[in-house]
């Protein structure tokens, strides 16, 4: 059976092992088609095994993590594509489209898997750049909606929007409003109350 790189040789022992994992050979072929990643923006890992790697083989498959309902389904599938090994020691040889903090060559645990799926859902909802900026300052997504303010060209532009939305400085200062120091105000805002990420998305500090 062809993987992306290398093959799973179907022998009677492999068929028996697949049966233990609740797969038939045709079902595994269908599952490979369903879970194989196109590496086109979906969170993915390239899964091999330490046994094959130590034997000089890069046999493996790019797998779309978002195509699974849960961690157990993912692990079971990974074991199935290496049913020619009695107890495959899974190896994540590369990754794409999720933060490095959840990548582990020695393989991810269930918490990391769930974080990656949540990250993917947040990116679909809010956009990759906004979510990546948020991740610069927060470890989980619990406070995204409360913290997110929007996107601005610069910290000073954000400061201007705060002044325009919250203060009528022309009324209170008259012509002196032309001399208001937006740059200094922005420095104060982002020193204490706000963060701006690399893609110019602003988040309130909570």
Annotate each language-model stretch with its function.
Residues 1-40:
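Ribonuclease/tRNase effector modules and their secretory precursors
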Residues 18, 63, 181:
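Residue-level signature of catalytic and energy-coupling elements of molecular machines
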Residues 39-84:
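N-terminal ordered "arm"
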Residues 43-48, 60-64, 89-93, 193-206:
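Ordered hydrophobic segments in well-structured contexts
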Residues 49-52, 159-206:
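Acidic, proline/glycine-rich low-complexity IDRs
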Residues 69-140:
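Structured domain cores in non-transmembrane regions
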Residues 126-167, 203-206:
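Extracytoplasmic/secretory-pathway segments with low complexity and glycosylation-like composition
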């Amino acid at each position: 059976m062809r993987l992306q790189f290398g093959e799973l040789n179907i022998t009677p022992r492999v068929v028996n092992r697949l049966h233990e994992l609740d797969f038939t050979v045709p079902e595994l072929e269908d599952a490979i088609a369903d879970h194989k990643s196109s590496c086109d923006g979906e969170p993915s890992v390239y899964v091999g095994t330490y046994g094959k790697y130590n034997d000089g083989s890069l046999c493996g498959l790019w797998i779309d993590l978002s195509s699974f309902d849960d961690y157990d389904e993912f692990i079971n599938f990974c074991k199935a594509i290496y049913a020619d090994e009695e107890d495959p020691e899974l190896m994540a040889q590369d990754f794409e489209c999720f933060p490095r903090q959840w990548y582990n060559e020695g393989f991810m645990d269930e918490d990391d898997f769930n974080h990656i799926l949540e990250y993917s859902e947040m990116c679909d909802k809010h956009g990759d750049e906004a979510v990546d900026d948020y991740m610069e300052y927060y470890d989980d997504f619990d406070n995204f909606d409360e913290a997110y303010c929007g996107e601005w060209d610069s910290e000073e532009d954000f400061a201007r929007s705060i002044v325009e939305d919250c203060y009528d400085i022309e009324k209170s200062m008259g012509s002196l409003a032309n001399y208001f120091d937006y740059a200094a105000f922005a420095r104060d805002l982002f020193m204490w109350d706000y963060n701006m990420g690399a893609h110019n998305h602003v988040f309130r500090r909570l």
